[in-house]
């Protein structure tokens, strides 16, 4: 199937009327440890290619791996947050395959003895209900390198004239979280897939184990989809759509595969068990035939001891598990007294935690929401970054709010102060001073500007004296322009009306 043949797809409502989708989600999360999984190389995104490598992560002869303790603790915390059983004995295994992004020609992973098993995540849906997704396992492994293919129209290896390998990512610690089959979702399957990945992403952020930047590959999702006729017990043949790199794409990929597979089955064909590539135009294309575990020839990793976390360690780490983000948001919503719609907008903007942190600095939630949910969202969109990537902190936003509350800044001038902070000019009060933005509080200075504006506009003065007090707005505007917005508009209006006998 390609984008050009979408007319051949079965209507989605028709699909769910006759077939039952079965999904399975495999999510890879890169851990934000200081170093890689089995060596001392820095774990950092965006470095020059092949500068964060060593004999261990390049798989050179004689180099031996040493397990990263912080990665193990992060894996245990993830397992606990997913309500998993932490196994008392976990073993690493070699997953053998040959591909240019794998310098050792095998990947150190976990096979039949993972660190966490049999969990679940209660996923919040848009209508306020939850859907329990059962977790089969969460296991540790190392990431592969990254390939860049040149000369191919698709950016993939097929048709490429040159392939470049960057091994900076090779050996970065990963947690792969695998669900049990998700059944019974029906027409909500695409929504539930997206909601699950969304919830997982929020959970990883709350745990502070990963930045889960899907655009940078620190969170990657593979969606498995199969169809079975309504009432059938046996699962259909599944496909696995690899490396879906946005929340919206997760939903689109599942929906597309359901429609595509239904078209294949309706035509009397057989769904091929294969991996598929997702295209941003909203369709999937064939990748390779899907391997089985036997194809990888797993065997125990001889250079690493088993992982045997003590009960004391597990219980200590259990105390570090935070409140689930969506439950925290519900509590915060009740505290703030905002509607579901307002809260949803804040969630979609990624502003909830930022607003909460700003409130913690002693300002009202209303003022904090106004900044993070409006002006700063616009600035983030203009810069093409996430809201929490803006170079301004909740403490700095709170400082701006306090300057307004203290009468030192107007809302209009406050926006200029925030722009100065974003530009790296310093703390809010310093920016206010350096830019000369503080409100003028001296009545004699304001009165002089008022007198000048009145003298320049005698016709407007006569209107005000005649009772048309709304005409005072023109004088107020002239004064604000003359003072470059640094006068208190309310005080200016009082002085104008008083001068015209309308106080």
Swiss-Prot record:
Pfam families: GatB_N, GatB_Yqey
Superkingdom in the source lineage: Bacteria
GO biological process, one term: translation
SUPFAM superfamilies, per database record: GatB/YqeY motif, Glutamine synthetase/guanido kinase
Molecular-function GO term, any one: ATP binding
Leading EC class: ligase
Keywords linked to the UniProt accession: ATP-binding, Ligase, Nucleotide-binding, Protein biosynthesis
Annotated EC: 6.3.5.-
InterPro entries membership: Asn/Gln-tRNA_amidoTrfase_suB/E, Asn/Gln-tRNA_Trfase_suB/E_cat, Asn/Gln_amidotransferase, Asn/Gln_tRNA_amidoTrase-B-like, GatB, GatB_Yqey_C_2, Gln-tRNA_amidoTrfase_suB_CS, Gln_synth/guanido_kin_cat_dom
Gene3D superfamilies assigned: 1.10.10.410
SMART domains: GatB_Yqey (SM00845)
Catalytic activity entry: L-glutamyl-tRNA(Gln) + L-glutamine + ATP + H2O = L-glutaminyl-tRNA(Gln) + L-glutamate + ADP + phosphate + H(+); L-aspartyl-tRNA(Asn) + L-glutamine + ATP + H2O = L-asparaginyl-tRNA(Asn) + L-glutamate + ADP + phosphate + 2 H(+)
Subunit structure: Heterotrimer of A, B and C subunits.
Function field: Allows the formation of correctly charged Asn-tRNA(Asn) or Gln-tRNA(Gln) through the transamidation of misacylated Asp-tRNA(Asn) or Glu-tRNA(Gln) in organisms which lack either or both of asparaginyl-tRNA or glutaminyl-tRNA synthetases. The reaction takes place in the presence of glutamine and ATP through an activated phospho-Asp-tRNA(Asn) or phospho-Glu-tRNA(Gln).
Similarity-based family: Belongs to the GatB/GatE family. GatB subfamily.
Protein name from the UniProt record: Aspartyl/glutamyl-tRNA(Asn/Gln) amidotransferase subunit B
This protein's encoding gene: gatB
């Amino acid at each position: 199937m390609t984008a050009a043949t979408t007319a051949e797809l079965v209507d989605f409502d028709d699909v769910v009327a006759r077939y039952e989708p079965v999904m399975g989600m495999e999510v890879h999360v890169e851990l934000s440890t200081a170093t890689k999984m089995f060596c001392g190389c820095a774990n950092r995104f965006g470095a020059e290619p092949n500068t964060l490598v060593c004999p261990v992560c390049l798989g050179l002869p004689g180099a031996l791996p040493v397990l990263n303790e912080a990665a193990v603790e992060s894996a245990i915390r993830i397992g606990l947050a997913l309500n998993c059983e932490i196994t008392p004995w976990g073993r690493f295994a070699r997953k053998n395959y040959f591909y240019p992004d794998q310098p050792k020609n095998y990947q150190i992973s976990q096979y039949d003895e993972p660190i966490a098993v049999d969990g679940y995540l209660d996923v919040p849906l848009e209508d306020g209900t939850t859907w329990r997704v059962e977790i089969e396992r969460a296991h540790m492994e190392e990431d592969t390198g990254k390939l860049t293919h040149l000369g191919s129209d698709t950016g993939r290896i097929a048709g490429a004239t040159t392939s470049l390998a960057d091994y900076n990512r090779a050996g970065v610690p990963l947690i792969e979280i695998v669900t049990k089959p998700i059944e019974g979702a029906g027409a909500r399957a695409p929504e539930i897939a997206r909601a699950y990945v969304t919830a997982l992403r929020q959970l990883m952020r709350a745990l502070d184990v990963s930045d889960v930047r899907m655009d940078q590959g620190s969170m990657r999702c593979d969606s498995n989809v199969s169809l079975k006729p309504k009432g059938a017990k046996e699962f259909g043949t599944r496909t696995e759509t690899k490396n879906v790199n946005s929340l919206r794409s997760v939903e689109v990929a599942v929906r597309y595969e359901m429609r595509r597979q239904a078209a294949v089955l309706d035509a009397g064909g057989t769904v091929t068990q294969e991996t598929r590539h997702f295209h941003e135009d909203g369709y999937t294309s064939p990748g390779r035939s899907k391997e089985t575990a036997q194809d990888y020839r797993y065997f125990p990793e001889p250079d690493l001891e088993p992982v045997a976390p003590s009960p004391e360690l597990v219980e200590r780490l259990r105390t570090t598990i935070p409140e689930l983000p969506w439950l925290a948001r519900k509590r915060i919503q009740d505290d703030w007294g905002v509607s579901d719609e307002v809260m949803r907008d804040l969630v979609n903007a990624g502003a909830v935690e930022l607003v909460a942190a700003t409130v913690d600095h002693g300002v009202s939630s209303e003022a904090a929401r106004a900044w993070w949910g409006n002006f700063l969202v616009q600035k983030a969109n203009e810069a093409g970054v996430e809201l929490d990537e803006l170079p301004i902190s909740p403490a700095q936003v709170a400082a701006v709010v306090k300057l307004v509350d203290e009468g030192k800044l107007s809302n209009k001038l406050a926006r200029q102060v925030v722009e100065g902070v974003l530009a790296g000019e310093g703390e809010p009060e310093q920016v206010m001073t350096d830019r000369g933005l503080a409100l003028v509080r001296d009545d004699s200075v304001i009165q002089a500007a008022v007198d000048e504006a009145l003298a320049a506009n005698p016709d407007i003065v006569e209107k005000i004296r005649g009772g048309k007090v709304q005409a005072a707005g023109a004088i107020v505007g002239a004064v604000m322009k003359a003072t470059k917005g640094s006068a208190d508009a309310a005080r200016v209006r009082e002085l104008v009306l008083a001068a015209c006998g309308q106080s």
